[in-house]
A protein has these predicted regions:
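Secondary-structure boundary elements
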Residues: 1-67
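Generic ordered-secondary-structure signal
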Residues: 19-22, 34, 38, 55, ...
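Loop/turn elements at helix/coil->beta-strand transitions in domains of secreted/extracellular proteins
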Residues: 29-35, 85-91, 108-114
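Aromatic-acidic/polar surface patches that form glycan- and anion
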Residues: 30, 68, 72, 175
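Active-site neighborhood of thiol-dependent amide/isopeptide-bond enzymes
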Residues: 47-107
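His-Asp-centered catalytic microenvironments across diverse enzyme cores
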Residues: 96, 104-185
Length: 185
């Protein structure tokens, strides 16, 4: 017997497809899908040391159902996989200097086609007109774009300047393209 608990059509995260469907429910545009995946992941994860030091929490189904806590690489890998299979192939993880997070490839033909969506630190960095999230390459060239944001959201113990997260972006950041989707509960 495998009991399932789904309340008000929420929490059916037992398969990758069901998790992705719930996380993008209500999206009317591609940009909505990007924001909803980011929002649903960050709302349901806690920044905490993982139980396992390996890649076990990189699977979105395991991360959301079993662990619920993570460090940046776990959230980044799971988020990148959701973006990739959610209609954004070419999405990637950006390995900054001390942080890892996903960039959704929203529009491959646009100047800012990639959007750095930091699930772990509850932030994304908007262009100067505050219209669209930027990719890490732009932020690496202009750290002020990251300094304007409050990382870890509005609920923090004390205000901390965003200088440290901004300094993580550099022109020599690395990349990975995780697309893991294998576990079912």
């Amino acid at each position: 017997v495998n009991p399932r608990l789904v309340i008000n059509d929420r929490g059916n995260w037992y398969t990758f497809d069901a998790l992705l469907e719930e996380f993008t429910r209500g999206a009317q545009t591609r940009q909505d899908r990007v924001y909803l995946i980011w929002e649903n992941m960050r709302r349901n994860l806690y920044h905490e040391s993982p139980l396992f030091a390996d890649n076990t929490p990189h699977d979105p189904v395991r991360l959301m159902n079993i662990f619920g806590s993570n460090l940046c690489d776990d959230a980044g890998n799971a988020g990148c996989s959701l973006y990739h299979h959610g209609g954004f192939p070419g999405s990637r993880n950006r390995a900054l200097h001390g942080h890892v997070q996903c960039e959704a490839l929203v529009d491959p033909d646009a100047e800012f086609g990639l959007q750095f969506m930091d699930i772990d630190m509850d932030a994304f960095y908007l262009d100067r007109e505050n219209e669209l999230p930027l990719d890490g390459d732009v932020i690496a060239q202009d750290h002020d774009l990251a300094r304007r944001e409050l990382n870890y959201g509005p609920e923090v113990n004390a205000f901390k300047a965003s200088d440290a997260p901004a300094a993580l972006f550099r022109p020599d950041d690395g990349y990975a393209h995780p697309t893991l989707r294998c576990h079912e509960i």
